From Swiss-Prot:
Signal peptide: none annotated. GO terms for molecular function: ATP binding; proton-transporting ATP synthase activity, rotational mechanism. Its main location: membrane. Keywords: ATP synthesis, Cell inner membrane, Cell membrane, CF(1), Hydrogen ion transport, Ion transport, Membrane, Transport. The keyword DNA-binding does not apply. Pfam families: ATP-synt. Gene3D superfamilies: 3.40.1380.10, ATP synthase, gamma subunit, helix hairpin domain (1.10.287.80). The gene is atpG. This is ATP synthase gamma chain. It is found in: Cell inner membrane. It comes from Hahella chejuensis (strain KCTC 2396).
Length: 287
């Protein structure tokens, strides 16, 4: 029964793959929980810095930092965060599609575009696509550190300070829940006005050391770095969630295929037995 042997070989192969996808699902679930914890731990820090920047800028209107000044956009920069590995559904493709939509809007207005690609998938995609990648960073791992990110962010901040770019956007996937990851394009520079009602209603008269200007300069740079770091951490949580869902789907699909093959094997075996019985009966009748 040659057909039956082939089917059994297929079943064994798919069961082996199913074990791998099931294990990957469990690993992704564990990594996702850790990434969610890092994501939750980083949010209060970024929110507090943003609040302090708003207070200082409001209390010192005579000093307008370069990062707060609006200017005509002739060249636009993007920091795009992706994954290093695949097997995470359409996570990267959705973010790239959203970013290319934004890029097209600026190019239609006559603006040029520079890119900082974080993650191997973004690097490969935009270099093949023809984007002007001026900075690249990959292999940050499942527990990225801020020190590894700072260098690439500085390239874009220096470009903004020198007038080489006039807008800076951050593109990444936002973690909504385990089933939903939303691609987001957020403006980093110039820093959008804060939507803090309490800050608008009240005024705090702080004393700054050494001075408000020096403090604001340092906080703005640190805020941009923290935003990119938070995006990398959040994108990692999205990656693990998407991979967990993709591997669960693959495991379930493998189970369905195995059931179909086992049914086909049983039918082939039944047909072979029926044929053997028919041959025996025919032989006995001939005798």
């Amino acid at each position: 029964m040659a057909v039956g042997k082939e089917i059994k070989t297929q079943i064994a192969s798919i069961k082996s793959t199913q074990k791998i996808t099931s294990a990957m699902q469990l690993v992704a679930a564990s990594k996702m929980r850790k990434a969610q914890q890092r994501m939750a731990a980083g949010r209060p820090y970024a929110d507090r810095i943003r609040s302090v920047i708003s207070h200082i800028a409001t209390a010192n209107p005579e000093y307008r930092h370069l990062y707060l000044q609006e200017r005509e956009a002739k060249r636009v920069g993007y920091i795009v965060v992706s994954t290093d590995r695949g097997l995470c559904g359409g996570l990267n493709v959705n973010a790239f599609r959203e970013m290319m939509r934004s890029m097209k809007e600026w190019r239609d207005k006559g603006a040029e575009v520079d890119l900082c690609a974080v993650g191997q998938k973004a690097i490969s995609f935009f270099r093949n696509y023809g984007g002007n990648v001026v900075a690249a960073l990959s292999h940050l791992g499942d527990d990225p550190s801020l020190t590894k990110i700072v260098g690439s962010v500085k390239v874009m901040l220096d470009a903004y300070a020198e007038g080489k770019i006039d807008r800076l956007y951050l593109v990444h996937n936002r973690f909504v829940n385990t089933m939903t990851q939303k691609p987001t394009v957020a403006q980093l520079l110039p820093l959008p006005p804060a939507e803090d009602d309490e800050m608008i209603r009240r005024h705090w008269d702080y004393i700054y050391e050494p001075d408000a200007k020096g403090l604001l300069d340092g906080l703005l740079t640190r805020f941009i770095e923290s935003q990119v770091y938070q995006a990398v951490v959040e994108n990692n949580a999205c990656e693990q969630a998407a991979r967990m869902i993709a591997m669960k789907s693959a495991t379930d699909n493998a189970g369905g295929i195995i059931n179909e093959l086992e049914l086909a094997y049983n039918k082939a075996r039944q047909a072979a037995i029926t044929q053997e019985i028919s041959e025996i009966v025919s032989g006995a009748a001939a005798v």
